[in-house]
Structure formats: structure tokens, C-alpha cells
A protein has these predicted regions:
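Hydrophobic alpha-helical segments
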Residues: 1-155
Length: 155
């Protein structure tokens, strides 16, 4: 059960939670679309970043959507982006100039801006999902269960 009631506005359970204010829902959705479609960053890179952050933020709804990050560690751009995203999710105050130097080895300034904006937005979404208690049963697009994820954690 979520901590606040779902509104009548929005499509997904997440949207219904922020949909108590239609204007916020509308602008939130517009920003989400812009971040996913208005970028030259690879869609798989964005998805791996989203998955990485989901596990740090412990958002069940977000974790069961596609499971754990799944990429070849030789994919330097994805590896760099997910490492940065993980640090951001753990403690953004630890990020310093040297981390941006590492990002610059793989990304342009525009891409870094887009990546950081994406990470910030997704973090906000997932933290909201977590505090609202948006659990796995609300995720209609889940590909794995929390039970299965917990089993892989034990191995």
C-alpha cells in the first residue's frame, strides 16, 4: 500500500502519486520525455544508469522494471556513466573535479550536462517511489521479482 492515495490523474502508479497536482504531473512528464528523447546519449546507457541508481535508492518499483544493470564492463562509456551515477546516488557530496575529469575522457560537455541532469531527475523519481512505498506489485512492466533479485544477491 502506498503512503498516500493514488490520484485519478496519470497513467502509471508513479504518475498517479504525483498527479494530485495536474500541473506538476504535466511538467514532470514533459521533463521525463525531454531527458529520454532529447539526448544523443545511447538509450542503453541511460537504461543502465537508471538501473544502477534504482538499486542504490532501493526503489522496488524501479528495480523490478528491468532488474540489475546488465552490460559488458568493457563498454567504457556505460561503465563510466554507471560508476558516476552510483557515486551520485550514494553520496553526491563526494563528487569532485577529478570525477568530472574522468567523465571528460568519454563524454563531451553537452553529454555530461545531459547525463547529470538525467541522473538527478531519475534519482528524484526513485526517491519519491521509495518514500511513497511504491513497491513491486505496482510495476506492471516488471521483468523480475524482488524474491528473484534477493536470491541473486545471496549467490
Amino acid at each position: 500500500m502506498t503512503r498516500i492515495k493514488l490520484s485519478d490523474n496519470g497513467i502509471s502508479p508513479f504518475e498517479k502519486l504525483i498527479g494530485h497536482n495536474k500541473i506538476v504531473l504535466e511538467k514532470w512528464t514533459e521533463l521525463e520525455i525531454a531527458l529520454f528523447t532529447g539526448t544523443k546519449l545511447d538509450k542503453n546507457l541511460l537504461e543502465q544508469v537508471r538501473r544502477t541508481i534504482a538499486f542504490e535508492n532501493e526503489c522496488e518499483y524501479c528495480m523490478v522494471k528491468a532488474g540489475k544493470p546488465n552490460f559488458d564492463s568493457n563498454q567504457k562509456r556505460i561503465n563510466t556513466a554507471t560508476a558516476f551515477a552510483q557515486l551520485f546516488a550514494i553520496d553526491h557530496k563526494l563528487i569532485n573535479d577529478s570525477h568530472f575529469d574522468i567523465l571528460r575522457e568519454e563524454f563531451t560537455e553537452k553529454e555530461i550536462s545531459e547525463l547529470c541532469s538525467f541522473i538527478s531527475f531519475i534519482t528524484a523519481c526513485q526517491k519519491l517511489g521509495r518514500i511513497y512505498n511504491l513497491t513491486e506489485e505496482f510495476q506492471i512492466n516488471k521483468t523480475i521479482t524482488m524474491t528473484e533479485l534477493n536470491k541473486t544477491k545471496m549467490q
